[in-house]
C-alpha cells in the first residue's frame, strides 16, 4: 500500500487517466474529487460491499430458480414419454 500526504488543492495521478484531488480538509472528513474515464466504476467502499452482497444473494436465488425449472422440465418430460 502506498501512503501519501496531500494538502487541500493537491492531487495524485493514477496512471495517466485518473486523478484524485483533495478539495477540502476538515477536522473529521476529507472531501475528494476523482477524475476518471467513464468506463471506470468508482464506489464508496460500503456501497461496493453492499453491491457484492446483493450480487451473491441474487446468484443464490438464480441457483434456486434454476433448480426449480430443471425439476419442472424433468417432470414434464417424464410425463411425455
UniProtKB/Swiss-Prot annotation:
Molecular function (GO) terms listed? mRNA 5'-UTR binding
Gene Ontology terms describing biological process: bacterial-type flagellum organization; mRNA catabolic process; negative regulation of translational initiation; regulation of bacterial-type flagellum assembly; regulation of carbohydrate metabolic process
Keywords in alphabetical order: Bacterial flagellum biogenesis, Cytoplasm, Repressor, RNA-binding, Translation regulation
As for what it does, the entry says: A translational regulator that binds mRNA to regulate translation initiation and/or mRNA stability. Usually binds in the 5'-UTR at or near the Shine-Dalgarno sequence preventing ribosome-binding, thus repressing translation. Its main target seems to be the major flagellin gene, while its function is anatagonized by FliW.
HAMAP family referenced in this protein's UniProt entry, alphabetically: CsrA (MF_00167)
Name the coiled-coil region(s): none
**Superkingdom of origin organism:** Bacteria
Could you tell me which species this protein originates from?
Borreliella burgdorferi (strain ATCC 35210 / DSM 4680 / CIP 102532 / B31) (Borrelia burgdorferi)
Q: Which PANTHER family match?
A: CARBON STORAGE REGULATOR (PTHR34984:SF1)
Family affiliation: Belongs to the CsrA/RsmA family.
Q: Which GO terms describe its cellular component?
A: cytosol
> What is the recorded name of this protein?
Translational regulator CsrA
Localization per record: Cytoplasm
Family matches, as NCBIfam families: csrA, PRK01712.1
Subunit info? Answer: Homodimer; the beta-strands of each monomer intercalate to form a hydrophobic core, while the alpha-helices form wings that extend away from the core.
- Record keyword Repressor present: yes
Amino acid at each position: 500500500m502506498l501512503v501519501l500526504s496531500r494538502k487541500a488543492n493537491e492531487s495524485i495521478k493514477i496512471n495517466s487517466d485518473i486523478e484524485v484531488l483533495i478539495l477540502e480538509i476538515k477536522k473529521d472528513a476529507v472531501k475528494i474529487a476523482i477524475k476518471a474515464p467513464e468506463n471506470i466504476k468508482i464506489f464508496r467502499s460500503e456501497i461496493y460491499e453492499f453491491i457484492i452482497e446483493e450480487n451473491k444473494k441474487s446468484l443464490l436465488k438464480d441457483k434456486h430458480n434454476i433448480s426449480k425449472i430443471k425439476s419442472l422440465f424433468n417432470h414434464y418430460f417424464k410425463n411425455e414419454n
